[in-house]
Amino acid sequence: MKQDVRIAIDRGGTFTDVYYKISGWREQEGIFKLLSVNPKLYDDAPTEGIRRVLCYASGEEIPRKVPLDLTRVSSIRMGTTVATNALLERKGEKTAFIITEGFRNLVEIGNQARPDLFDLTVSRPSPLYQRVIEAKERVVLENQFSKTAGIVQGITGEFLRVEKKLDEEALYQDLKELYNEGFRSISVSLMHSYTYPLHEEVVEKIAKRIGFTDISLSSKLTPMVKIVPRAVSAIIDAYLSSTLRYYLDSFKKNFYNVKPNTIQFMKSDGGLVDIDNFTAISAIMSGPAAGTVGFAKTSSLHADDKTPAIGFDMGGTSTDVSRYDGKFEHIYEANIFGLYIQSPQLDIQTVAAGGGSRLFWRNQLFSVGPESAGAFPGPACYLNGGPLTVTDANVLLGRIIPDFFPKIFGPKENESMNKDIVIEKFSELRDIINIDIEKEKTIEEIAMGFIQVANETMCRPIRKLTESRGLDLSAHHLAVFGGAGGQHACAIASLLNIEKIIIHKYSSVLSAYGLALAHVTHEEQMPCLSVLDEDNLPLIQSKFDVLDKKAVSFLENEGYLESQISTELFANLRYEGNDTTMMIAKPKDSWDFKTLFEESYKNQFGFSLIDRKIMVEDIRIRAIARASNQSEVDTVFASETENENTVFIRDNKPTMYTPVYFAEVGKVNCHVYQLSSLPVHSLITGPAVIVDTTQTLLIEPSFTAKIFARHVLLEKTKSTLVVKKNVDLDPITMTIFANRFMSISEQMGQVLQKTAVSVNVKERLDYSCALFSPDGGLVANAPHVPAMLGSMQTAVKWQHNYWKGKLVPGDVLLSNHPIAGGVHLPDLTVVTPVFDNNKDIIFYCAARGHMVDVGGITPGSMPSNSKAIYEEGAAIKTFKVVKAGTFDEKGLTQLLFDEPAKYPDCSGSRTLRDNISDVKAMLSACHRGRSMVEKLVVEYGLDIVQRSMYGIQAAAEKAVRDVLKAFSVQNSQKPLKAIDYMDDGTPLQLEVKIDPETGDAVFDFEGTGPEVYGNWNAPIAITYSSVIYCLRSIINQDIPLNEGCLKPIEIRIPPSCFLNPSETAAVVGGNVLTSQRITDVILKAFSICAASQGCMNNLTFGYDGENGEEGFAMYETIAGGAGAGPTWNGTSGVHTHMTNTRITDPEVVERRAPVILRRFCLRENSGGKGEYHGGDGVIRHFEFRRSMHCSILSERRSRAPYGMNGGEDGAMGVNTWIDCSNPDFPRYVNLGGKNHVLMGKGDHIVIETPGGGGYGAVSI
């Protein structure tokens, strides 16, 4: 009988997993693991795995390091981390980047947001390229009626003008120089190449002629709008291509007699591709994608089971979670290792919590990760001097049994996993904790606490995948895999109220098994900017036909028969004026994308935009080739009735007994079973432990385990939702609640971003969501905009005091007035009370978002020249936007549109429709927060929830007191002093006096200048925000940011100074300018770092509505340079301190607004020199294509960002208007820091933002 060998291999960082199936005269199926790196025995782990399988198949020993005969092998499928590791370790090819002139630093600036709000060093991934060439070319968008010569139509149907043809000669010389310097890899991304790829294709021809071997064009890889992620994708592909190709070529050399399509690799999108077509950009998530395919194909109870499943893959350093509901969920833009890329990939959420995650006692709270012990030294029990980890906690609690692990630990890799060292280290930690909390905790209680915190941490991304989309978690199965997942499965399911857990027999190698079940795929994509309606449908269908033929032809050329190939059609749709796209699959029997899109949008966001056109952004074809000898799924039951009709075996004899610790019942002597010894249809009642050669399954009390042929099914035996009324208030409980409160805030933010319409909220992320105590004190917030986080507390407290005793369930409040805790008028705050049994307010949920326009004297409501608050738009102290459950749209319209227009020279909101939609989005976010709080109260009881809330605030208070006491000692108990001056000369003065015994501190702003006849007056809430931000940044630890941070602080602000202005004062600049200057002064007083750019560089442009049409407004805050510190250089081109909003992608700007972005790059040498230099500012240069109002609101234009400790000052910013009313003699006008101009068509504005100050004297 002819033999057929199929092999699937997942090469991970530590272990390589192998699944194989041998058919024919020697039938065999099996799995094994081997070390990914073991140079003493083999050069390449996958090749070694294949050699071992061939030994099994032939019954003969095959020597190592000789080519292997693959005659009997029909399939080798691999997932690999080669590209991932090269990216993480920065071991790719020397690469150059070609981009349109004026944008050389675009990728470095990115979206200008910093990864960690409170990291003053602003650590960002460094660029992957070594050189940049600016191609002399420019293509700009036009409308079809433009009379300008040279109009062409792009692939999307958009009209463009080739303003400047590519200078081929100059480019040739630049590329030739690169080639002579040893470059062989280039990436290319030119403006609007997603629709006009011709210039990129010319670059490719020139580069090939010179001899470059790796050329990645953004227009070919991901022809989608947004140049930044498209460019990053091209750069990654170019950077990794050579490394990946070297590995693939080396791998192929290990074999001979290889049939076509034998060796295939997993792509990030969950499809397989032949080794010769495997690309770097598709390889980044190869391993995790294989795991998702594995659980998707093995998590059905029976063939007709439609229950969606959550995949839970717990590894050593992190945990991956994903969802499958009968179809794979893809995303097309993602943040990978801090890099935003465009590439189809499975939607996999990762959290830095795994078996190797380290355990910490910090600020009287338990903390798990994100630091990891890694493969070496690994957990303490590995006997290589490692720290305590989640694995060690499981060992201590009896959930991992060392006797069932091989003796591969210790310096000589010949010892057993060691529990004694774990007991010793936990005992040391116990002594520290018990002293701090003044209670007696056992090492088991402490270890269990860390496990509970780890479990709660791992639940957060699962809730994000489901509850934030409005999906019911309890309606899912949990599919658990990965080496560490089995020890946490029951606890995770209980936390999520999931009743069934599915664990495949190959769960510890499910990524490898998933490869065996995957299909070969090929995708084709085409940009297609069309309105989705009956008139355009024939054109859209014809484009689909072109892609369909192309995709099918590709697979046929690979050797697949037409009968093996099927196709799936997708349209990437969005509402007009909205950048949120949804990839919608074509219905089987119709072309009704519209209905599916509207239903999907409403299901996910809670509403639809009835009056908006639906736009087709791009179309995509996914062609799937199914192998004839491959099974589709691997279900738990052979039939739908197997579980109900089966008599299960209950009297199984355990292998041994072992003590296991559980939170509910303490230590229990548990049965231990070996999975291989359990007959099919065995029933194991928890608590128990089931061990296998590659995994350990913990069956907790109230769970049972049913053994099937290829699965273990864990089932909850009683309701998961139990009111935990007897929970003690201890650090474990508080840490768990800190995670739950944070999760609520995060989900509120996700709902707000998804349901909002405006660019400000949805794209720039200019919003914040938070949870507040019954009296309005901050409890928890997601990491949104710092200027909002501390100030929202003031707003919620004002509303609480104003409405005390007068609110009823269903009431929701709206406010933006500075006197009521607002900061500036475009920031609307929605406050939702949460009631206990419709009686008492037990929490508040609040959301704040920056509206595009709320009226006033200029479009965008950010006037540079306002002198009174009414000029800045609608001012609302309090308003019941929802009264007893009824949304008052008429009242809201009156406040936003009618009232502001009553004042001289003022308009009502120019974007009323978007504003109302965004308010509804904030209502949706608060509704989500309220429902989650109510659920939490039902689960635990109100008493423990609120006591935990206050306990977490107390922990934050202690952390701040400890830091302040340390500063007092460091400064010899002297007051900390600083003074700085606004650009108009107004002083901003601070003295901080700290009590060295208690940590109490007075922040006294006596000496600060009076209210100004301008708009940079700062409502008092802004100072509170700045103080809380600085304290959290100085602490530099992951503590909860809440009201407790301000408990030790007394803030004294003189009456009538510009930090405490009158009710009618103009304040629009206080939030966006003065907040940054307050922050600089505080950090200066504490001698933390040099000044950052001290500004948000607020640029607004737009025009009023005419003839019944809405007006237009666009608002940006622009990055600058960060200040240097005692151990770090300042980062260039980044938002600092009190803001972290994103900047709109250049291509999106030019699509949406009648402007051309001429330059967006770093302002070289604008950072202050020093031992550590300040970061550079940026240059952002617009040309206006019609007359528009333009306002610039900025600081640091007359006073430079200071250096510290001998470091030099950063450069001041400059705002320049180029008046081109006479094109032959343009007029260059310095606008100063704050000004408003009516720009004519063809005029320009150039914003040069400040650099950061340097730190330390320059070495000579």
From Swiss-Prot:
GO molecular function per UniProt: 5-oxoprolinase (ATP-hydrolyzing) activity
One record GO biological process: glutathione metabolic process
Pfam families found in the cross-reference section: Hydant_A_N, Hydantoinase_A, Hydantoinase_B
Gene Ontology CC: cytosol
InterPro entries reported in the protein's UniProt record: Hydant_A_N (IPR008040), Hydantoinase_A (IPR002821), Hydantoinase_B (IPR003692), Oxoprolinase-like (IPR045079)
The family this protein is said to belong to: Belongs to the oxoprolinase family.
Name under which the protein is recorded: Uncharacterized protein C11D3.14c
Species name: Schizosaccharomyces pombe (strain 972 / ATCC 24843) (Fission yeast)
